[in-house]
From Swiss-Prot:
Keywords: Autophagy, Membrane, Protein transport, Repeat, Transport, Vacuole, WD repeat
Bilayer topology annotation: Peripheral membrane protein
Induction data: By sucrose and nitrogen starvation.
Subcellular localization: Preautophagosomal structure membrane; Vacuole membrane
Family, per entry: Belongs to the WD repeat PROPPIN family.
UniProt cross-references to Gene3D superfamilies, sorted A to Z: YVTN repeat-like/Quinoprotein amine dehydrogenase
Subunit structure: Component of the PI(3,5)P2 regulatory complex at least composed of ATG18, SAC/FIG4, FAB1 and VAC14.
Name the UniProt record assigns to this protein: Autophagy-related protein 18h
Tissue and organ expression note: Expressed in roots, flowers and leaves.
GO BP terms: autophagy; protein transport; response to starvation
Biased composition, class Basic and acidic residues, residue ranges: 896-907
Protein's organism: Arabidopsis thaliana
Domain notes: The first protein part may form a beta-propeller domain involved in specific binding to phosphatidylinositol 3,5-bisphosphate (PIP2), leading to the association of the protein to the membrane.
Family matches, as SUPFAM superfamilies: WD40 repeat-like
């Protein structure tokens, strides 16, 4: 009766027979109901207002924009010594390549409408090989992972956040095709088809790695022949509803100059990299039988308490996992896949759980030239979702599916001799943990990772569209930022310059073996967050704002250098936002607290600041709306005919013998030495190696103000009116070469930091770039003509002032190649024009006319990894440590594990069972 009375009171609000207590109990629910109604009304009004404001942010509707599935920044290599920074966008109906190298000329290279594209990657210019042309004449080449079975249509994905509203039936993608698109001929010159989903692609001048669900195929970068394959840990399924094979984060695979890193599917070896447990007491001894049972009782009590604590923790962990799994099942009570349903996972058995716990989070680093495993270690206790090398190829970044902490390791191979002619590696000492980057307490998938040129800055982009910026030292240590006192600019923050812990100055007669620094946990110094509501509110009041959020990032300066800047920038960052804009940010030092107090505390010399003061502000400078619209025409720019600074540049085209559109090479300019410094190496860093020093080759202008191909000589010229191209200095001391770090001091005594390199020592596979700069005032440092590299090209658009659409002339380029006998199916008819479909019966196509001598069953293990034949690199920006590294080429034949996706054929040898035979390949993956 009491419950009925309450119902009547709540429903009617009138009952004179209620008691005092009942009246009180009825008043509270009514009050709470009234408050909840007010909150619901207010929130509904705010939601509708914010929706209307967000809808009015752009003049054109979101329906006019093509839906983005993939976004990333990459480098379009125009020669061995130069490249351009480009933005790659994959859509539900094709892809787009934009030149973002210069802020004054952001244009489209390619805009093609085709099948849905879920992954894009530019292939670097392959290393030259005598007598083998391969696909070098077709470069630059773009790799596009597409789904041929699905046409363009509505797709729901959180990879890039560009999701259309109003669609209820999402399209599930399963991309199984890797297409090689030539930016010279604007055709697909090669196609790889697989039976299972392709999740990621990584490229280097040596190999092209294609990552499937639980297997990785590695192809030769020059001939695109299958070299080997490895089994990997199953790729975590992290996609949203309706998506299969699209949103897996950055991807658990990384390719460096010589090494391949991937998630292992096998546990660590019991004899290497692990400690064996020891018994506390001898067998058969108990506290009651031992004469000195007092100490044993205490010891057993301590051990029992440890086991009890471990059991409680294990029980709590199992309970947490059970509740989490229950909530996860409730959350995924729909068409979307859950994390527990990842391929290859086994649950419900104790043995399988134990085996999986030993495997999960393990990383393998493999030398893809000698095919030896040089390092194997456990980086996380959860499945790995992201692996990335720095520009040097020796720093490895790892992240798990939770993304709370990102680990940074330095890979240092330690060769060991097991017998005559046999060589292996000590996995326990082949890696050094340097940093743990703390992102946050909540879980998020890592979507993008990028390093600066000197590996001092790193940007981590999460699935929440937030960019986390960290500063670190390439050689570890907790001192990552320091205050530098300048006579003109005053105190400012700057990254700390450090040297390797294994090196010793040349003036030291005694070698000291220093241990590596301890691992340090670093916090973010700045963030770029997604704040759409603030952006909408600012637009309402008429305050101009920049688009927020970040989906992809790269450290690059596309805007001209500010001559009158109150605070000099530490670095520049380009980001792609969820709204389809590219925003240029600059990193500005921010000193916390009172400046005078900071100077007093640190003294006259530069010192370290506290953690609260180690902050960096990000300031937006400029933005561009680059997302493709539905009414934009397709673009196919002629890469060979591009000019740069009014000059034809022959180095922009790949050095091939059959190219008919090569331009006349530049005539040599007069080179002047602006400044020289002769200094005996004493262990300190030379002035010219500081990050503030830049080098610029000059091109004298003619009477009309344009640059000439040759200098006529005579007269005077103002320095401020001369266009100059800044040479981007790259490190050369961080290359992944074999080195025994414990015995290098014998050669260091006589050579020091800078010495003459051997002819077969590795050079940088990431050469410097030459980027256009505006006229400036000040001293310039011209460089030698042979080391200057090629100037970047820039498109000259014809813009319609009425429509605002940029159009370009499209010269017709015809490429003919003789058809030869080869193991591939070689047919010029299979080169696809735009809007053409690929033949369904052809598994792998090739239209570049590969010589018959390059068959698919030949493994090029004799290809040297030395990059000396790639031309001379740019000026070093740091002390040269290459003479400390001694390359050891292993002749050991590594037998690859037999995989399930490679086709079987009786003609293949046992050590060639992972090669593809003929031109018709079908890769499959079971499980």
């Amino acid at each position: 009766m009491k419950s009925n009375s309450k119902v009547n009171i709540n429903n009617n609000g009138d009952n004179h027979n209620q008691t005092k207590n009942n009246g009180t109990n009825g008043f509270l629910p009514n009050s709470l109901k009234f408050i909840s109604t007010c909150i619901r009304t207010a929130s509904s009004g705010v939601r509708s207002a914010s929706a209307s404001v967000a809808a009015s942010l752009s003049s054109d509707s979101h329906e006019l924009k093509d839906q983005v599935l993939w976004s990333s920044f990459d480098r379009l290599h125009t020669s061995e010594s130069s490249f351009k920074n480009v933005l790659l966008l994959g859509y539900t109906n094709g892809f787009q390549v934009l030149d973002i190298d210069d802020s004054n000329d952001v244009t489209e290279f390619v805009s093609r409408r085709d099948d849905p594209v879920t992954f894009l990657q530019m292939q670097p210019l392959p290393a030259k090989c005598d007598g083998v042309e391969g696909f070098r004449s077709s470069h630059p080449i773009l790799l596009a992972v597409a789904d041929e079975a699905k046409g363009s249509g509505p797709i729901v994905t959180s990879r890039d956040g560009s999701v259309r509203n109003g669609y209820e039936d999402p399209l599930a993608l399963s991309p199984t095709v890797v297409r090689f698109y030539s930016l010279r001929s604007h055709n697909y010159v090669h196609v790889l088809r697989f039976r299972s989903t392709v999740y990621m692609v990584r490229c280097s001048p040596r190999i092209v790695a294609v990552g499937l669900g639980s297997q990785i195929y590695c192809f030769d970068a020059l001939t695109l022949e299958n070299k080997f394959s490895v089994l990997s840990y199953p790729v975590p399924q992290l996609g949203n509803q309706g998506i299969s094979g699209v949103n897996v984060g950055y991807g658990p695979m990384a390719v460096g100059a010589r090494w391949l890193a991937y998630a292992s599917n096998s546990p660590l070896s019991s004899s290497i990299g692990r400690l064996s447990p020891q018994n506390v007491t001898p067998p058969g001894v108990s506290p009651s039988t031992s004469p000195n049972n007092g100490n044993l009782v205490a010891r057993y009590a301590m051990e029992s308490s440890k086991h009890l604590a471990a059991g409680l923790l294990n029980l709590g962990d199992k309970g947490y996992k059970t509740i989490s799994k229950y909530c996860q099942d409730l959350k995924h009570d729909g068409p979307g896949p859950s994390l527990s349903s990842s391929p290859g996972r086994k649950v419900g058995r104790v043995g399988s759980h134990s085996a999986e716990s030993d495997v999960v989070g393990t990383v393998i680093v493999k030398d893809f030239e000698s095919r030896a495993i040089i390092a194997q270690f456990r980086a996380h206790t959860s499945p790995i979702s992201a692996l990335c090398f720095d520009p040097s190829g020796t720093l490895l970044v790892t992240a798990s599916i939770h993304g709370n902490n990102i680990n940074v390791f330095r890979i240092m191979p330690t060769p060991t001799k097991n017998g005559p002619g046999a060589q292996s590696y000590d996995w326990s000492s082949s890696h050094v943990p340097l940093y743990k980057l703390h992102r946050g307490m909540t879980s998020a998938v890592i979507q993008d990772i990028c390093f600066s040129s000197y590996s001092q800055w790193i940007a981590i982009v999460s699935s929440k569209s937030t960019c986390h910026i960290y500063v670190l030292s390439p050689f570890g240590g907790e001192n990552v930022l320091e205050i530098r006192n300048s006579q003109f600019d005053g105190p400012t923050l700057a990254p700390t310059l450090s040297l390797p812990w294994w090196s010793s100055p040349s003036f030291m007669t005694t070698h000291f073996s220093y241990p590596p620094p301890a691992s340090v946990t670093l916090s973010v110094v700045s963030r770029i967050k997604c704040n759409n509501f603030f952006h909408a509110a600012s637009s309402v009041v008429g305050k101009p704002t920049f688009p927020s959020g970040c989906l992809a990032a790269v450290f690059h300066q596309s805007v001209p250098q500010e001559s009158q800047s109150s605070s000099p920038a530490l670095d520049y960052l380009l980001v792609y936002t969820p709204s389809g804009h590219v925003v240029q940010y600059k990193l500005i030092p921010s000193l916390g607290g009172d400046q005078a107090e900071s100077n007093t505390r640190n003294g006259a010399t530069s010192g370290l600041t506290s953690e609260e003061e180690l902050r960096v502000k990000v300031e937006p400078v400029q933005c561009w709306d680059v997302c493709r619209r539905a009414d934009w025409p397709e673009r196919e720019e002629n890469i060979c005919g591009l000019t740069y600074g009014g000059r034809k540049n022959a180095e922009l085209t790949v050095d091939t013998s059959d190219s008919e559109d090569q331009t006349k090479p530049l005539e040599k300019h007069h080179v002047y030495l602006a400044n020289a410094e002769v200094l005996i190496n004493s262990g300190r860093k030379p002035i010219w190696q500081n990050s503030e020093i830049s080098f610029y080759p000059m091109y004298p202008p003619d009477s009309d103000g344009k640059n000439l191909n040759s200098h006529q000589g005579g007269g005077e010229t103002e320095i401020g009116k001369v266009s100059a191209n800044e040479v981007d200095i790259r490190r050369k001391d961080l290359l992944p070469v074999y080195d025994n770090f414990h015995s290098v001091y014998t050669s260091m005594r006589n050579r020091g930091f800078s010495g003459e390199r051997d002819s077969d020592s590795s050079s940088s596979s990431d050469p410097g770039q030459v980027k256009e700069m505006h006229p400036f005032n000040g001293m310039v440092y011209p460089e030698d003509e042979e080391r200057r590299g090629s100037a970047h090209f820039a498109l000259t658009p014809n813009q319609n002032p009425h429509t605002g659409i940029v159009t370009f002339k499209q010269p017709v380029v015809s490429i003919s190649s003789a058809v030869k006998d080869t193991d591939y199916i070689d047919d010029d008819a299979h080169v696809l024009p735009k809007n053409a479909s690929l033949p369904a019966e052809t598994k792998i196509e090739n239209s570049s006319g590969i010589s018959g001598d390059s068959n698919v069953s030949s493994n090029r293990s004799d290809m040297s990894m030395n990059a000396a034949d790639e031309g001379e690199g740019p000026i070093d920006g740091s002390p040269n440590f290459e003479q400390f590294f001694e390359e050891v080429v292993s002749n050991e034949t590594v037998t690859e594990t037999e995989h399930k996706d490679a086709p079987s054929d009786g003609k293949l040898d046992d050590d060639e069972d992972d090669d593809m035979l003929g031109g018709v390949f079908a890769f499959s993956e079971e499980g």
